[in-house]
Amino acid sequence: TVDRMLARDYVVEDRMTLEVVATHAGREIFRGWALNEATVEKAARERMLELTAEIDGRPLSTWGCDGVVIATPTGSTAYAFSAGGPVIWPDVEAILLVPISAHALFARPVVLGPRSRLAVEVVPHTDGLGVVWCDGRRAVDLPPGARIEVTQSAIPVRLARLSDAPFTDRLVAKFDLSVHGWRGRAREDRS
């Protein structure tokens, strides 16, 4: 592996990242980034968190939920996937919003364009705190009325892969997908 790296025998991919800015009472309380996902989650197990999502300054929905996942295509096969989100191919530039265990009729994942500005606000007068996590790192607590804004970062992450296998092959291997269906090769011609 080291020899291949030294010989530059690898494939380089630029992966989209997210810029995450949290504010409360008009002042910035956190600025960071994420390669996979940023999440806003409830701090206390016994309560739901009331969150409002806005896209480009327009309200989308308010949910009583355990939180939301905001993911890149790289993160679409991680926490966002486990929460019910779709797989997004890594060469697609998009931002994915996935509510976590939302109590609402409209609680479906939403795929946004890469230049969208996504905001998530902890509804004022809500009991309890939200917590922002970036790629599994606890970033900041969000009191009621605080919000995060998430946009595509101008700085991608460059990844070196030793395999030039197409994403489909890597996806099948990662999730051990059955490419022959649940009945195996039962549909092949048996003549």
Segments and roles (model prediction):
Residues 23, 40-41, 54-56, 71, ...:
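Short beta-strand-to-turn element immediately C-terminal to the catalytic PLP-Schiff-base lysine
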Residues 33-35, 100-103, 129-133:
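Short Pro/Gly-enriched beta-strand edge/turn motifs at strand-loop
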Residues 62-106:
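Gly/Ser/Thr-rich active-site loops/lids in small-molecule metabolic enzymes
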Residues 1-66:
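Catalytic core of DAGKc-family lipid kinases
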Residues 22-24, 42-44, 72-76, 101-102, ...:
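Glycine-rich beta-alpha junction loops
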Residues 40, 56-59, 107-191:
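ATP/nucleoside-binding phosphotransfer catalytic cores, i.e., glycine-rich phosphate-binding loops
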Residues 14-18, 34-36, 47-51, 66-68, ...:
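A generic structural signal for short beta-strands and their flanking turns/coil linkers
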